[in-house]
Amino acid sequence: MNTRKLIVTTLLAAMSCTPVLAQNDKAEPYFTPEEMPNMLKTPLTPPDSLSAAFSYDLSRFLWGKSVRATERGEMAKADAEYGLQVVCREFAEPFGMEISKEKTPEIYRLLLDALPTCDEISWNPKNHFMRRRPFMVFHEPSLKPEDDAPLSKNGSFPSGHTILGWSAALLLSEINPDRAEAIVNRGYLYGESRVIVGAHWQSDVNAGYLYASVAYAKLHTSDRFLKQMEKARKEFKKLSGKK
C-alpha cells in the first residue's frame, strides 16, 4: 500500500469509527483508484528547478511567508486540517447552510463518498514524482511544524488539500449554484493556504485545482453518484425553501 493510500485509508477508518457516526457512515468511493483518470499520461508535471515556472513557485513561497503573521496566515493555519469535518465547517458559511450528518444527511453522504473518490486521482502522481515540499527544500519548519514529519513522506505534487477543497467547492456549487461564487472562492483560498503554510509549491496547488476538476467530471459518469447528487439537491431545496 503506498503512502498516500495509507494516509487516506487511515483517515476514512477514523471517520467511520467516530462515535457520532453510524456504521453506514463509512465512505464508499464511487470508483477505485484504477478506474480514475491516469494523470501520469498527461503533460502536467512539477516544473524544472531552472524554469520560469519554478521561479514563480519561489516568489509565491516568499509571498506566503510574508502573510503568515496576518489574518490570512491564521486562516491558512486552520486550513491545514484535512478531512470531511473541515469541509463541513469551512464551507457552511459560503454554502449558506450548516452541513452535517444530522442536519443535511444526503449532502453529507454525497461528500463522504465523493471527496475520497476525487482524492484517489492524486495517488499515483504523488508517489511517482515524490516532489520535495518547500519546508524540506529550505530546511525550515512550515507554519504547522507538527505536520512536517508525516508530510515529508508524501509527495508534494499535486496538493491533496487543494483537491479536497476544490472538489468540495465544485460539489457544493452544483447543489447550490446561487452561491457558487462564494463557494468557489473558499475552495480557492483553501488551496492557496497550502502555499502560505509552506507545505506546497504554487504549481502543486494549481495542479490540485486541475486534478480535482478532472475527478469531478469522472464522478458524473457514475449512476450512483448522479442519484445521490439528485438526493442532495432535493434536500437542499427543501431545507432552503427554494423551488
Set out the residue ranges of the language-model regions.
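Residue-level micro-sites within transmembrane alpha helices that shape
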Residues: T3-R4, G160, S203
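Bacterial Sec-dependent N-terminal signal peptides
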Residues: M1-Q23
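Interfacial helix-loop-helix junctions of multi-pass membrane proteins
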Residues: L189-H220, R224
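C-terminal membrane module of polytopic membrane proteins
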Residues: A215-K243
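Hydrophobic alpha-helical bundle signature of multipass membrane enzymes
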Residues: N24-V197, T221, Q228, L239-S240
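Alpha-helical transmembrane segments and their juxtamembrane interfaces
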Residues: A14-M15, L171, V214
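Residues in and immediately flanking transmembrane alpha helices
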Residues: C17-T18, E174, A217
